[in-house]
């Protein structure tokens, strides 16, 4: 299955946003020096990605997409397991975004595209989920 959702707006706070299981609460992440260096923190079925700025941003979520990202500032890839159908993405003081990602194992790649490089003229985080 290949799918791409429309970009959704998210207000970034505390320089992070979290991908987590549907119908759950995102855990509090421990941003160790190692996590900061890697650009993500993981805990309890969730991944928090580092955000460049606390600002309005767009999340573009894609499943098994072959589209390339030509201009980006940072790229982080992590394993992720979806326990039930669906995930949420939110930042600490933002609304919750929902995506109907099927249950299974994935490699999540988060591409950080700053506003000056983005077609949306705002910081954009492209998240590619690839089935493994």
Curated annotation (Swiss-Prot):
GO terms for cellular component: plasma membrane. Keywords: Cell membrane, Competence, Membrane. It comes from the Bacteria. GO terms for biological process: establishment of competence for transformation. The keyword Membrane applies. InterPro entries: ComJ_sf, Competence_nuclease_inhibitor. It is found in: Cell membrane. Pfam families: ComJ. It is a peripheral membrane protein. Plays a role in the competence of cells to be transformed. It inhibits the activity of the DNA-entry nuclease. This protein is a subunit of a 75 kDa protein complex, which governs binding and entry of donor DNA. The complex is a tetramer of two subunits of the DNA-entry nuclease and two subunits of a competence-specific protein. Only the complex is able to bind ds- and ss-DNA. This is DNA-entry nuclease inhibitor.
């Amino acid at each position: 299955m290949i799918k791409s959702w429309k970009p959704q707006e998210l207000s970034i706070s505390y320089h992070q946003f979290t991908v987590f299981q549907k119908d759950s609460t995102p855990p509090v992440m421990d941003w160790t020096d190692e996590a900061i260096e890697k650009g993500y923190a993981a805990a309890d079925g969730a991944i928090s990605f580092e955000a460049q700025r606390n600002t309005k941003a767009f999340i573009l979520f894609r499943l098994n997409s072959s589209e390339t990202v030509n201009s980006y500032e940072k790229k982080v890839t992590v394993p992720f397991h979806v326990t039930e159908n669906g995930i949420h993405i939110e930042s600490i003081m933002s609304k919750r975004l929902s995506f109907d990602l099927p249950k299974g194992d994935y490699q999540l790649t988060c591409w950080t595209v700053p506003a000056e490089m983005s077609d949306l003229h705002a910081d954009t985080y492209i998240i590619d989920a690839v089935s493994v």
